[in-house]
C-alpha cells in the first residue's frame, strides 16, 4: 500500500523519536513546521518539561519580521531559540526535525541556531 505524504511524515517522525530523546544534560530541540509558521522547543524528555520555546506566532516576532512562512523567518527563529537557550545555560542539544526533511525552513532554523552558539 502506498503511503501519502502525511502518513510518510508521521512514520518518519515516529522512527526519529524512537532514536532521539532529550535529557537534562542534553535536551531535545524539537522543530515543527506548518504551512504558515514554524515552532521550536527545547525539551527535557526525562522531566517532560519544555525549557525554552520560540515560534513565528509570537507578537514581538510578528511585528519585527512579519509572516513566518519563509526561510528568513526560520533563520530568525533559530537565532531566537539559541539566544534563549544560551541565556538559560543550555549549550548542547539533540536536533529533532519532527519527521520533516532536513531542507528549506528546517535547515535554515538549524543552521541559524548553530551559528548563534548551540551545539548539535
From Swiss-Prot:
InterPro entries: Ribosomal_uL18_bac-type (IPR004389), Ribosomal_uL18_bac/euk (IPR005484). Keywords: Ribonucleoprotein, Ribosomal protein, RNA-binding, rRNA-binding. Gene3D superfamilies: 3.30.420.100. It holds the Pfam family Ribosomal_L18p. One of its GO terms (molecular function) is structural constituent of ribosome. Part of the 50S ribosomal subunit; part of the 5S rRNA/L5/L18/L25 subcomplex. Contacts the 5S and 23S rRNAs. This is Large ribosomal subunit protein uL18. It comes from Cyanothece sp. (strain PCC 7425 / ATCC 29141).
Amino acid at each position: 500500500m502506498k503511503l501519502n505524504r502525511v502518513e510518510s511524515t508521521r512514520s518518519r517522525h515516529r522512527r526519529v523519536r524512537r532514536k532521539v530523546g532529550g535529557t537534562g544534560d542534553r535536551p531535545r530541540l524539537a522543530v515543527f513546521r506548518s504551512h504558515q509558521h514554524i515552532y521550536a522547543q527545547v525539551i527535557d524528555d526525562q522531566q517532560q518539561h519544555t525549557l525554552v520555546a520560540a515560534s513565528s506566532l509570537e507578537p514581538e516576532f510578528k511585528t519585527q519580521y512579519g509572516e513566518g512562512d519563509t526561510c528568513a523567518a526560520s533563520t530568525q527563529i533559530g537565532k531566537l531559540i539559541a539566544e534563549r537557550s544560551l541565556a538559560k545555560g543550555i549549550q548542547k542539544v539533540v536536533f529533532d526535525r519532527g519527521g520533516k526533511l532536513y531542507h528549506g525552513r528546517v535547515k535554515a532554523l538549524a543552521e541559524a541556531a548553530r551559528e548563534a552558539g548551540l551545539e548539535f
